[in-house]
A protein has these predicted regions:
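A cross-family glycoside hydrolase active-site/sugar-binding cleft signature
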Residues: 21, 78, 143-145
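Short, histidine-centered active-site or binding-site loop motifs used for metal coordination
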Residues: 24, 79-83
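Short C-terminal domain-edge/linker segments immediately following a structured domain
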Residues: 48-56, 75, 106-112
Length: 172
């Protein structure tokens, strides 16, 4: 699937980074919304009981979410999941698919398999002290949407076990 909007190049001089989100909806509804607007580069998760990966925007072009930061060299990945109200982590198959996608993003786009901060539970929107650290856009690696500066209303991707995902990626 390729979404026809946001076909603008990113700043290739910016540090390579990935941003993980949760859809807060299922596969079909999320894809339907993303085909109209706010498309990420990839969607990963369960589609009719099997894990799937869909690419909606080519890497190197601006994705539809995180508009204030889209000129950066970021790859946006939406995981099918609900992290706003519950302690969510991807199931094993989704975690493995995410790790495999991260390896491709590392090999093809240069995003290091790192997260810029130690593991912690920062709770819901606005409580993550890293939001104002100034690292996003200046440090390469993988970020959660909750790690990005402004607006202060994001919680995703929830309580992701970054170390576990990177361990899976290193075994790919």
């Amino acid at each position: 699937i390729t979404v026809p909007h946001f076909q603008q190049p990113v700043d290739l001089e910016a540090p390579r980074a990935g941003v993980l989100h949760t859809t807060e909806g299922g596969w079909d509804g999320s894809i339907s919304v993303f085909e109209r607007h706010f498309a990420p580069h990839f969607v990963v998760g369960l589609d009719r009981g099997k894990v799937a990966i869909a690419q909606l925007v080519p890497i190197g072009l601006i994705g539809g979410a995180c508009r204030a930061h889209n000129n950066k060299a970021i790859v946006q990945v939406e995981m099918i999941g609900f992290s706003k109200e519950t302690l969510w982590r991807p199931d094993e198959a989704t975690a493995k698919a995410l790790a495999a996608l991260m390896v491709v993003c590392h090999d093809e786009w240069g995003i290091p398999l790192t997260h810029p901060w130690p593991e912690a539970d920062w709770g819901h929107a606005g409580h993550n002290p890293h939001r104002r650290s100034g690292k996003f856009g200046h440090v390469a690696g993988w970020f959660g949407h909750q790690d990005m500066p402004d607006p202060d209303v994001h919680w995703d991707p929830g309580h992701l076990d970054w170390d576990y995902i990177f361990t899976l990626a290193q075994t790919e």
